[in-house]
């Protein structure tokens, strides 16, 4: 039972370490994600970072063309088999319980190798959260860097044990090598999964259903209601369960035993483990569905005269949506009883890097919380409904954007395109900070734009100049196509208008949904 005891003791130590870091011990009226579960969910979500598949197809096509019409079929088959066996993996790098890196595998490098290249000796004393158990090649370098802890999702590892590949024996040998590295390492290599607090899933479902993105979508699409959210969520649940869970219990036990988790194969540990994993996948699918992947909706500039100019500088919608879901996950660490807000800052370098995120790299993230080191009762928690202004929270709480800027792990470079993703419209307190920090783009909801409330106002966002603003709305260049006389069809669970030309072509091609000015996503 060594592994089980280690998992439980490390969970306890993780909870203790979070005390005093942005009020980690806070307990209040709303359920809250633990930091361990937040980092785990972000690692799973980073495995789904868009764009890598398209890069892989392009790379493979170039390779085939370079070999000529006949090509080396045997070599191509071998390379293809190896790529299928190596699973894309997400990684969250944490130092002093603060995120300093979000990564995913690329076409050429595993995510552990990318972490070594990006962080080097700075990995010392860091905690690493992988979406799959890393292979021995990654593990030996990470351990050598002096990391403190390596946590991984207890399912199919990076070198897959599920694929029917000819080199499955190599996968088992790699798993044994990784286990030996773990046994002889000073770093803790373990599974950190904590049960979700009571009512957490229900709370996430309710708040995701009511979030600005879903409600605005439902109001804007003719004939649609919020039932599309439930349908979209069910699709995501099926997709993520296939990707992150092992449906067959006996097969799951075999994998756990192969990767050194024999003690988790006995009940009640095994059943508890599977239930915790299912709960986290349900939560991830729920949050991901709150920023739906739609044809006509996305993050666009509202100014008609700037649409064509800005298009060439905006992110693909899939990437913008992915980053906003990161912010939505962060919002569930909030200390605000009324409204959870998350923010994440990314930048885009001049050229592509070795990371699976391409030219984009992580700057910082945050959520709204009270000052670091404070305890639950140190500051007022009342909102503007309370008559006594002295005991209202607004003078004490640190906004998500402010925390993201304060705890950023890299400088914001003026010559690069930097962007912040916020789950709500930035308030008048944060807008000048964002502009002053040199951030070039803001992606946010706009439900509160122009509103002035008792303790907080949102007047400056609409008037902001010098920073590009992309808000969740109908694509201005496609809005005209929503003719109420057109036939309807469901796409990703959402009612969408369909032209006769679309009907004719639908049987001849995959469901390729075009974005504005040539951007496209395969749904």
Swiss-Prot record:
Keywords: Cytoplasm, Hydrolase, Metal-binding, Nucleus, Repeat, Zinc
Cofactor: Zn(2+)
Residues binding Zn(2+) 2: 399, 427, 430
Domain (CMP/dCMP-type deaminase): residue spans on this chain: 71-169, 318-483
Sequence motif Bipartite nuclear localization signal, residues: 489-511
The protein's name in its UniProt record: Cytidine and dCMP deaminase domain-containing protein 1
Positions of the UniProt region annotated as Disordered: 1-27, 55-81, 478-523
Statement: the UniProt record of this protein carries the keyword Repressor: no
Short sequence motif named Nuclear export signal, residue ranges: 272-284
CDD domains for the chain: deoxycytidylate_deaminase (cd01286)
